[in-house]
Regions:
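Short gly/ser-rich anion-binding loops that grip negatively charged ligand groups
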Residues: 58, 75-80
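N-terminal transmembrane-helix/juxtamembrane module of multi-pass inner/ER membrane proteins
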Residues: 1-72, 109, 117, 122, ...
Length: 150
């Protein structure tokens, strides 16, 4: 018996995978945006951090792996070659999203550190992120949860 779960065999289920992405993509942006706007409307939102975290350096290039999860999210469906596997994968992603958004709504936490100014390609990526993201999703880390599933 293999320790790795079977992804199924055969062809990529394009229709089913794209259908799930057509549901999960908009759901992500709508629910995530809703949670952020609700937290912003609260006014004062707490932060949770340790003093030693101020010593962690800011590396602008880390925006690239951060953004890469969006690509990996979509590509992850190409590894699912059975209907049951596609559905299970999509439901795991949906569950992580629901849990994170519920936490963001119930216990919003604001990022306490201001990002330094960044220019060039990395600056453009940070600007694109800032166009739809607000600092009210400190915990749980939805990116890490999705990355573990992917």
């Amino acid at each position: 018996m293999s320790a790795r779960p079977s992804l199924g065999s055969g062809r990529i289920l394009w229709g089913r995978s794209l259908a799930w992405l057509a549901v999960l993509g908009p759901f992500f942006f709508l629910s995530y945006g809703f949670a952020n706007s609700q937290a912003a409307a609260r006014g004062e939102v707490a932060s949770l951090y340790f003093e030693w975290e101020h010593a962690i350096p800011f590396w602008p290039w880390t925006i690239v792996p951060y953004w890469s999860i969006d690509l990996l999210y979509g590509l992850s469906f190409l590894f699912c070659r059975a209907r049951r596997v596609v559905d299970r994968h999509a439901l795991r992603l949906l569950t992580a999203q629901l849990i994170a958004v519920l936490c963001f709504l119930q216990f919003p936490l604001r990022f306490a550190f201001e990002r330094p100014a960044v220019e060039g390609v990395f600056g453009a990526l940070f600007d694109a992120l800032a166009a739809f993201d607000q600092p009210f999703n400190q915990a749980p880390s939805l990116h890490i949860a999705l990355l573990v599933i992917i």
